[in-house]
Amino acid sequence: MPASFLVLGDQLSTDVTPWPTLSSDTVILIIETEHLTQAPRHLTRTALYLLAMRAFAERVRSLGFTVDYRRASSFAEGIAAHRAEVAPTEIMMNHPRGRRAASLFTRLGVTLLDDPFYLTPLDEFRSAVTTAKPATMETFYRRQRRRLNVLMNGDDPVGDRWNFDEENRLPLPKGGGTWPAPWSRALTDEEQCAVDELAASHPGGDAVAYWPRTRGDALDQLTDAVTRILPHFGPYEDAASTTNWHLAHSRLSVAMNLGLLHPREVVDAVVAAYNQGLIPLASTEGFLRQIIGWREWVWGWHQLRDDSYRSLN
């Protein structure tokens, strides 16, 4: 009997481990649980999640894998039904990001592999925050720059500065400024029908077109970000507007959080654009600080601390 590989809705990549080593007879299990379609959940969030999962299932089928895409009231029910029908030798999955989810899948007998969607293994993060005095995001970020060799000339930062905070903390221009339109892709008829079905029971407007649903969307959005949006990012990265919701932000976090983009490929694309003269150094540094610094810093503490951490301050 084949093994099965369970994929969650925030793990939508075939380019990370263990995909390159999966046998062609591995059954890919994707479970759409009922809580995803139960109110109250924002319409755009719910529709985006489901459309991305369904598109991923089609992509995996096109690669020759057998896909068991099923609806269930819970993961426990879905996994039990899959075991009864497929009788896999093993069900494995990349490590889920939530503690409760990890505990649940362990109880359900699923083998948890490492999480390949971040750049910093837990042991590395633990070492970083226990050896640095004080353990601040800035010291961690500089360590990341060296470890990942991002914007470095040997052991020194490109431009001989670790940050460009002075340049990157400007207020909005008088009058609010003019900003590049955000990336978008119109919904297909099939996608629109799925959104319409959800609209009756989910609050909020339909903004799904502004977010990627497929790997192709995510790559297109990444190209758009590095060529059209990020050149304007740095000076106003900390500014906020009451009339413009996107300013010059890349909005790539959704693609990364769904697994449609890996943070390393985002970093490499932005560095390549800087090397081509497309993005100023201050904007490049300010953006990469978010990806290899803040994103990894927050994720590391989430792994390292238990739930009591939320009430410490």
What are these regions (language model features)?
Residues 148-287:
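Glycine/tryptophan-enriched, flexible segments
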Residues 13-15, 36-38, 76-77, 100, ...:
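Flexible loop/turn segments at secondary-structure boundaries
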Residues 15-17, 38-39, 234, 264-266, ...:
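Short helix/loop capping segments that flank catalytic or ligand/cofactor-binding pockets
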Residues 75-211:
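Beta-rich, aromatic/charged-enriched effector core domains that present basic-aromatic interfaces
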Residues 1-70:
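N-terminal beta-strand-loop-alpha-helix module at the start
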Residues 285, 290, 295-313:
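Active-site cradle of extracellular carbohydrate-active enzymes
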Residues 6-10, 31-32, 70-73, 93-96, ...:
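Short His-Asn-centered micro-motif
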